[in-house]
């Protein structure tokens, strides 16, 4: 028998940054309207970005939560963990949950996040492997690392690289297998990637770029991997970190249009009435104007705020400015950061500098008329949020270009203090 049907004004599916920012935005304009949050997770809200630090032991699991029960009580929010969204019936404003219950809503925000994308490698369903997307994943991997002697990480994105560093520091022999010709493809350029690769090699890690796994087989110790070139690898710990895919299965038959993500307009509204999306959204890109996925924490927060304000009818809501990529990465005592586009605009200019002694590298890309369009660095110091604002505001840096390239942190903050009031 179906469980009782709940009624709420605002239903939020998901519980991370976008969802929490939407709650804040709604409550700024509507202090009393009932809010219900449903999430597939079993825990209070936390950020997936902190999970590598749970694995390493730098962050205690009990200290990573973004909000506590008091937050939901103060904001009059019904928080329902272990309540995954199963199906959406947008034509009658009803969400069906995996436990058999249903919620009838007036306004719905879809912020359901993503799950690991598992590659279709023959034999992958016959071996044990780890992923890293939830707190439970992190705790499981943390326990396994302590026992591992020979580990293989599939994928050289930021999740895989963080985990590989933890394994190296724990004393395991670690091999990273990556299909692309460089590490951290899509995050950093070739120069930065080579610096990251050298740091891993210096620490004892093994790197195999341009490599594809074509078969997996179980062994007594764990798994045997066969690569396209015939090379074989043995692993007692296998981590699959080959990317994520947005959670959208519940949209089948819902009338909500989706492609790579959930398609939204500049107020984060989907193609269905009374339904918004954030973080899982495919929204307008800043540089191209076409709809793109930008699955990073700062953007999820912005999208959640815009969606929440729009749902509550806040007259102060502004259009989403567009997606600007921003990524930071700490590795073996070093750090790398990338903000904006790596594509050089027509007539644009690229300025680079590299100090071999300090290992500092900077690349800045400018449009023909002066604004910054992208900035990337290793062991460089600049504020990613300030750089993103310089890009979004199309600030002409022509008069300050030499000073800016020499010290983007100081000059960026100088511009901020003088003009952003």
Curated annotation (Swiss-Prot):
Keyword set includes Flavoprotein: yes
Binding residues for FAD: 15-18, 39-40, 279-297
UniProt GO molecular function: NAD binding; phenylglyoxylate dehydrogenase (acylating) activity
Pfam families according to UniProt: Pyr_redox_2
Cofactor(s) this protein cannot do without: FAD
pH-activity dependence text: Optimum pH is 8 when measured with benzyl viologen. Half-maximal activities are obtained at pH 9 and pH 6.8.
EC numbers on record: 1.2.1.58
This protein's UniProt keywords: FAD, Flavoprotein, NAD, Oxidoreductase
Reaction equations catalysed: phenylglyoxylate + NAD(+) + CoA = benzoyl-CoA + CO2 + NADH
UniProt-listed Gene3D superfamilies: FAD/NAD(P)-binding domain
Main EC class the enzyme belongs to: oxidoreductase
Inducing stimuli: Induced anaerobically by phenylalanine, phenylacetate or phenylglyoxylate.
N-terminal signal peptide: none
Regulation: Activated by magnesium ions and thiamine diphosphate.
Swiss-Prot/TrEMBL GO biological process terms: L-phenylalanine metabolic process
Protein purpose: Involved in the anaerobic metabolism of phenylalanine and phenylacetate. Catalyzes the oxidative decarboxylation of phenylglyoxylate to benzoyl-CoA and CO(2). It can also react slowly with 2-oxo-3-methylbutanoate and use different electron acceptors such as benzyl viologen, methyl viologen, FAD or FMN, but NAD seems to be the physiological electron acceptor. Also catalyzes an isotope exchange between CO(2) and the carboxyl group which proves partial or complete reversibility of the oxidative decarboxylation reaction.
Family, as annotated: Belongs to the FAD-dependent oxidoreductase family.
Subunit organization: Dimer of heteropentamers composed of an alpha (PadG), a beta (PadI), a gamma (PadE), a delta (PadF) and an epsilon (PadH) subunit.
Protein name: NADH-dependent phenylglyoxylate dehydrogenase subunit epsilon
């Amino acid at each position: 028998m179906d469980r009782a049907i709940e009624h709420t004004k605002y239903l939020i599916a998901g519980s991370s940054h976008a969802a929490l920012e939407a709650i804040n935005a709604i409550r700024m304009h509507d202090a009393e309207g009932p809010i219900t949050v449903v999430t597939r997770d079993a825990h209070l809200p936390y950020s997936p970005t902190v999970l590598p630090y749970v694995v390493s032991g730098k962050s205690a699991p009990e200290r990573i939560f973004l909000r506590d029960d008091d937050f939901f009580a103060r904001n009059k929010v019904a928080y329902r963990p272990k309540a995954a969204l199963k199906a959406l019936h947008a034509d009658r404003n009803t969400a069906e949950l995996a436990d058999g219950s249903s919620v009838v809503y007036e306004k719905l925000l879809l912020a359901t996040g993503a799950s690991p994308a598992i590659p279709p490698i023959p034999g992958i369903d016959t071996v044990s492997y780890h992923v890293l997307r939830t707190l439970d994943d992190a705790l499981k991997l943390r326990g396994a690392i302590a026992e591992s002697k020979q580990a293989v990480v599939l994928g050289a994105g930021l999740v895989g690289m963080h985990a590989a560093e933890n394994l190296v520091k724990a004393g395991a022999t670690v091999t990273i297998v990556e299909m692309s010709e460089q590490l951290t493809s899509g995050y950093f350029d070739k120069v930065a990637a080579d610096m990251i690769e050298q740091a891993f090699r210096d620490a004892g890690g093994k790197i195999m770029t341009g490599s594809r796994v074509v078969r997996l087989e179980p062994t007594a110790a764990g798994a045997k991997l066969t690569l396209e070139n015939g090379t074989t690898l043995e692993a007692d710990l296998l981590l699959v970190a080959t990317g994520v895919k947005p959670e959208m299965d519940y949209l089948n038959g819902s009338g909500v249009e989706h492609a790579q993500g959930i398609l939204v307009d500049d107020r984060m509204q989907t193609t269905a009435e009374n339904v918004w999306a954030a973080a899982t959204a495919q929204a307008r890109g800043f540089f191209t104007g076409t709809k793109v996925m930008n699955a990073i924490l700062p953007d999820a927060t912005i999208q959640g705020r815009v969606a929440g304000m729009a749902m509550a009818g806040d007259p102060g809501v502004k259009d989403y400015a567009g997606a600007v990529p921003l990524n930071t990465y700490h590795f073996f005592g070093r750090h790398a950061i990338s903000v904006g586009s790596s594509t050089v605009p027509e007539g644009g200019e690229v300025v680079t500098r590299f100090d071999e002694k300090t290992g500092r590298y900077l690349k800045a890309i400018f449009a023909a008329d002066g604004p910054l369009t992208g900035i990337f660095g290793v062991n460089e110091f600049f504020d990613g949020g300030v750089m993103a604002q310089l890009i979004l505001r199309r600030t002409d840096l022509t008069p300050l270009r030499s000073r800016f390239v020499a010290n983007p942190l100081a000059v960026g903050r100088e511009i901020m203090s003088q003009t952003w009031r």
